[in-house]
Amino acid sequence: MNVNVGIDIGSTTVKIVVVRDGEIIHKHYERHFSKVREKAVELVRAARGLIGEDTPLRCSITGSAGLGVAKAADIDFVQEVFATRKAVGVHVPQADVVIELGGEDAKIVFLTGQLEERMNGSCAGGTGAFIDQMAVLLDVTPSELDELAQGAERIYTIASRCGVFAKSDIQPLLNEGARKEDVAASIFQAVVNQTIAGLAQGREVKGDVLFLGGPLFFFKGLQKRFQETLKLDDAHAHFPALAPYAIAAGAAEYAGGTQKTYTVDSLLAALEKAADAPVVANYLPPLFEDEQQYEEFKNRHAMHDVMTQNVTMYEGDAYLGIDCGSTTTKLVLIGEDDQILFHHYQSNKGNPADVIREQLTKLYELCGDRVHIVSSAVTGYGEALIQNAFGVDFGLVETVAHFRAARHFCPDVDFIIDIGGQDIKCFKIRNKCIDNISLNEACSSGCGSFIETFARSMGYSIEEFCKLGLFAKHPIDLGSRCTVFMNSSVKQAQKDGAGIDAISAGLSVSVVKNALYKVIRAHSPDDLGQHIVVQGGTFLNDAILRSFEQEIGRDVTRPAISGLMGAYGAALHAKDNRRDTTTLIGTDILAGFEHNVRSTRCGLCENHCNLTINDFGGGRRFISGNRCERPLGGTKKADLPNLYKWKLEKLKSYGEASGIANPIAKIGLPFGLNNFELLPFWTAFLRKLGFETVLSDVSTRDMYMQGQHSIPSDTVCYPAKLMHGHIENLLEKGVDAIFYPCMTYNLDEERATNHYNCPVVAYYPELLKANVSALADFDFMMPYFELADKKRFTKHAVKYFCGKYPQIKKKQVIAAVEEAYLAQDEYYIDVRIEGQRAIRYADEHDLDVAVIAGRPYHVDPEINHGIDQLIASFGLVIVSEDAVWQLTDAPEVHVLNQWTYHSRMYGAAKYVTQKENAQLIQLVSFGCGIDAITTDEMRAICENGGKIYTQLKIDEISNLGAAKIRIRSMLAAVEEGRKLAEQQNA
């Protein structure tokens, strides 16, 4: 009798499979809540009676958290991809591809053709842990999330790169009232996208596909999304009952070939030895040495408090502040002396409007006839929704609300850091107004919600979890990395047997390091300031506050109402700006308050925005998801000059039919990357040679999905990923060939030491040729051309085109070259003339100019997500960097300036510092390595010239919530600065 035991110790669960003579006689699956070794012992002990005390057995361990246990117990370890292949070979031999999703691991194994195995690295995006986190965010269990997904009507775009980014997309959807069913299905679609883009990396998933792992077994909604995306029918998509245990079954199969034999008791003894093994890890100094040190710390911070008075004991006028944040809703009512009469702080649970209705009803009851709420203000992510729903008097951007509250506690404040549930906001104060704003871009690294979801996943409340870390003797050093990578650090610490207290303290330190070094990019405490106010609910956690003070080496001010500062600032703003009457709805309307949500897609322009329509009864309605004013009806802002819009229309015009009689061939031009600049050149050149040119359509999300299967790396920027869809689009149009040359150099504008294209722009045609299978037998023209040297280009063009098409003569190529350079020059002149017209309009109408500095392809609406329209909606005239860079001398920069696009941006930044009504907004594509250089230089040029630097990161994430905060904060700071200047000059 042969008994083999396979133990799969994953990142969130432990699985055991017992095989007797080739038949599975026992299988079990349990979450370990980080008690990895103890749970393994428990599962073996539970199978003891079934196996028999003296029965000889073989055992092997697998799984992402299994190696440490296997080493400590001296039990054979099998790598999990190998275990997967073992299981498949025995149980589903016809499989072509295996997709396995675990707690924090994802794998694809290609079994036919060229054998290939791929695993996620240290990123846990698109795995079971991610689904768990999203369920917590929606305040449902994972199984309820699955039920919701099956009632979906539409799919929202949610970033599939990693869990934290997806969270940044989901939260604004919830705040804007999106249906939970649709969000749930969109979460599953994000997992599918992450698996295909992140792991398949250009290799097609086809044939018989076997889906393994807990998430793919338990979640029917996820199964449906995989089947639909991969276009698999039921005959080719396999979801076996063994799915959650397959890797453990593979480990049992592998164990059959090992040498060591055990009895159940000797196996238990080995595992128990592992459970008691000492931990080897990097430690940090403790947060507090003893209770006395902690008491002194608490007493010091207790000094920064605010007066309170019970609302039932107060009589007179009162002012309401609401902070509808990304994960929590806060309400504060203050009296005439700024004392707090009432406050409330709770999780949104995905529906902030319900929370506020409930609390307003309660508040009106407490106020009776004695207290009159005469003014109100709302701030935060849900500001617009709540202002419309409840008739709140004022809406203000959250940075301004937090600054107003901070000034109340520390009049000399010169630096504020606010760590909320999902965002980190830092702002420097100069001359009593906000001078510089740092927001975490598209990443919630080191924010409060990460610690909260982590605490919950380990079975603790956030308060209990954080208290555990206060007196940890040896906090674990988890680094200062993206939170999903930190998950892996925590996993490693768990493998090593670190206690919950050490992990809790280590996480607190990591959150602080992320805020300081990733968001603020501080080099020393002096970069922050002398009078630092910390706020946001996360700083109510003493462990994080202590870590922050230890890291910067100085004491800070934490108001006792740290978590209520946005709402308190809003209440102070309502008091400062009180009007004669309030528009806040009263008890009668509140009693009949209702909130109905429906979704639709706007068809008024090419953005095709997903609109969420919130009806509140009584004729009150709020529409979100729009990037322009059109779907809102009513009075529309005058169409202000917008060079982004003008350039897009101008470039699209090059796609119009040329009417060439008897063309040599129909050549496709992909409408992306550097073709957003060189389209005039190539169109004129090819048409002069006698070709019909066909332009691919303007990018859309659907086009991206069409080409997604051939993207070989998920780390490349979104503009490059879109090129795969453009190639597919041109192939569908039936072109004879596609022309897309490789170009190491750009045109030389003589403002830099060199004139390179970035490597992605320069050589992406090579990558497309290698990865888009349809190009294998297609005429994909990708010669290496350089346009900076006209003579050299002419020589190469003659050789290439006369060699490929004998009917084309040398003199035709020479004539085409002349026409192409002329067309390109005319385009540049048109851009500059249009730019000057826009600037004149702004000057004549006393408007601000937003110089959007980016790359030519940032004009693509699928890449910028309508950011130009969003900025224009605030009453700014839009100009691009290529219209203004030449209006000033080249600025001094502290880096090797060798990129054409970069030198334009530096020139645009200098121009902004010389024009009073111009503001700079830099667009950066996420994943753009060389823009890491430009951002610091652009900031330095702006700040040295007395201007505010604003950066917006753009990628797959289409929700503009964070961008809106940044733009409004910048405009508020500019306005405040002007008011201050007027006062000083008066």
Predicted regions and their residues:
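An N-terminal assembly and electron-transfer interface module characteristic of large anaerobic redox
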Residues: 3, 120, 124-131, 444-451, ...
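Short glycine-rich, Thr/Ser-proximal phosphate-binding strand/loop in the N-terminal lobe
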Residues: 4-46, 116-117, 121, 322-362, ...
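Glycine-rich phosphate-binding loop plus the immediately following alpha-helix
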Residues: 36, 113-154, 162, 244, ...
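Glycine-rich phosphate-binding loops at beta-strand->alpha-helix junctions
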Residues: 65, 200-229, 240-244, 379-382, ...
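Glycine-rich phosphate-binding/hydrolytic loop that grips phosphoryl groups
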Residues: 128-132, 239-275, 404, 451-453, ...
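Adenine-nucleotide phosphate-binding core of ATP-dependent small-molecule kinases
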Residues: 166-197, 488-517
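Phosphate/ATP-binding catalytic cores across multiple sugar-kinase/actin-like superfamilies
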Residues: 186-207, 251, 299-308, 362, ...
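Acidic, glycine/GT-rich loop-and beta-edge segments that sit at the periphery of enzyme/chaperone cores
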Residues: 257-317, 425, 576-640
